[in-house]
Design a protein with these regions (language model features):
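Local cysteine-cluster metal-coordination motifs and their immediate loop/turn environment
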Residues: 1-2, 77-79, 99-129, 157-163
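FNR/FR-type flavoprotein reductase catalytic core
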Residues: 1-103
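Short secondary-structure transition/capping segments
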Residues: 14, 63-68, 94, 116-122, ...
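Short Fe-S-cluster ligation motifs
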Residues: 27, 34, 122-126, 130-167
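Short acidic, glycine/serine/threonine-rich loops at helix termini
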Residues: 84, 107, 135-136
Length: 167
């Protein structure tokens, strides 16, 4: 949303395509409408907007001759990967906003390490925005699962002190 707002404020024509799993998860619709010249809402299940994923109207618009100077994609890695797969054959510049785990903000911990253009980059200092054609999404998605067990444990764990009765 802040990117769309900033682009609109500088006079850029903004086409927004936002996607959600279902109607209950739709957020910031009014805010997007306020800064987009055109807004397309997609829901996986068709309960709101058009049924499908964001790449569907994106490809339709490109095939119909829409002349996008740039596509900016922000969201889940799998979605960004497929946005890039959609725009690349048409050579539409695509910027992805990567948001891996960032611990220290200096690149020292390596938690936000990515491969971009065959080189190691750190989202916290080199990004978070990168040329989508250069990002190794498969590696990024694999790295995103590294802490899955720890995260599950953190959600399920209980403090033993809370289990004791107060004397």
């Amino acid at each position: 949303l802040p990117v769309a707002q900033a682009l609109k404020a500088q006079g850029t024509k903004v086409t927004g395509i936002i996607g959600f799993r279902n109607k209950d998860l739709v957020i910031l619709e009014d805010e997007f409408r306020a800064c987009c010249d055109e807004l397309i809402i997609m829901s996986d299940d068709g309960s709101y907007g058009q049924k499908g994923v964001v790449t569907m109207p994106l490809e339709e618009k490109i095939k119909a001759g829409a002349n996008f100077d740039e596509v900016i994609t922000i969201g889940p890695l799998i979605m960004m990967k497929f946005v890039v797969k959609t725009t690349k054959p048409y050579n539409v510049k695509t910027v992805v906003s990567m948001n891996p785990i960032m611990v220290d903000g200096t690149g020292m911990c390596g938690g936000c390490r990515l491969t971009v253009g065959g080189k190691t980059k750190f989202a916290c200092v080199d990004g978070p925005d990168f040329d989508g054609f250069e990002v190794d999404f498969d590696e990024a998605m694999h790295r995103g699962t590294m802490y899955r067990d720890f995260e599950a444990h953190a959600r399920e764990a209980e403090c033993n002190l809370l289990k004791k009765e107060v004397e």
